[in-house]
A protein has these predicted regions:
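Structural motif
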Residues: 1, 32-34, 104-106, 131-133, ...
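N-terminal active-site segment of His-dependent metallophosphoesterases
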Residues: 1-46, 140-141
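Active-site glycine-centered loops adjacent to acidic/histidine catalytic or metal-binding residues
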Residues: 4, 35-36, 70-71, 135, ...
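Secondary-structure transition/turn motif
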Residues: 6, 109-111, 187, 226-232
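Extended active-site neighborhood of metal-dependent phosphoesterases/phosphodiesterases
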Residues: 27, 39-130, 142-165, 171-219
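Flexible loop residues that form catalytic
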Residues: 36, 137, 171, 221, ...
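A short C-terminal boundary segment appended to hydrolase-like catalytic domains
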Residues: 209-243
Length: 243
């Protein structure tokens, strides 16, 4: 899981390199993004430098990507170039991906479709876990802060639907909230773009401006989330056991 990463700079390449090295001991076959995949505007002329080149060590080994659209991704052509590139794994602007008991709901928060989201988060019997990923944060203590208009409607919806984890980006930092209505909200915006400072907010459990990616593990009884820096062990970790 990464967000706010497609800057084609040294920080992005360092995070990508750490992902590739980490995968050798901690295998993963999927990468989910919280958007801002291609800075500054989603121009396909930058796909090679900002996506294919830094993540070649993952793409060449068949790692599947499931991207969300961020605000920068829609400037050039409303995101159409990213949507039409198979490597980003976006069949539509809003989509559901299901795998081995996981229901991953990926949302275009540039134009939030509440009715679609309410239906998409309605889990089936075979869905053990529901994770929702989109760009603009419900709760954030960074430069942009929490997104106006998302509260209280989205937290209430996610609680009703039994969502287990919400993953956002937009603010270039790492933030994990306290459990709010039984749900953890994470801002993972440290994939390569210039970092933003954290501000004190009542809902924050942990916040740090640091480049990173998330390693998310699914078990029968819990989800484990680890924030992985450029070097060294995870700097934050938590588990959630659902509502």
């Amino acid at each position: 899981m990464i967000g706010d990463f497609g800057a084609a700079n040294d920080a992005q390449r360092s995070v990508a390199d750490r992902m590739c090295r980490y995968r050798k001991r901690h295998p993963f076959d999927h990468v989910v993004t919280t958007g801002d995949n291609i800075y500054p505007d989603g121009d396909p002329a930058r796909f090679e430098a900002a996506f294919f080149e830094p993540y070649d060590c993952l793409l060449a080994r068949g790692v599947e990507w499931h991207a969300a659209l961020g605000n920068h991704d829609i400037i050039f052509d409303d995101g159409r170039s990213e949507l039409s590139e198979p490597a980003f794994g976006m069949p539509r602007r809003n989509y559901v991906y299901r795998l081995l008991g996981l229901r991953l709901v990926v949302v275009n928060s540039n134009a939030l479709d509440y009715e679609w989201l309410a239906d998409a988060t309605r889990a089936r019997v075979e869905d053990r876990w529901t994770i929702v990923a989109f760009h603009h944060p419900v709760f954030s203590a960074g430069l942009h802060g929490s997104t106006p208009g998302f509260r209280p409607s989205l937290p209430r919806l996610f609680q009703r639907r039994g969502v287990d984890l919400v993953l956002n980006g937009h603010d270039h930092l790492y933030l994990a909230t306290k459990k709010l209505r039984g749900i953890r909200y994470v801002v993972t915006g440290g994939g390569g773009a210039t970092l933003y400072p954290c501000n004190p907010r009542w809902f924050v459990a942990f916040c740090i401006p640091r480049h990173h990616f998330l390693y998310v593990s699914l078990f029968a009884d819990r989800i484990e989330v680890k924030a992985i820096p450029l070097t060294g062990p995870p700097f934050h970790a938590f588990s959630t056991r659902g509502l």
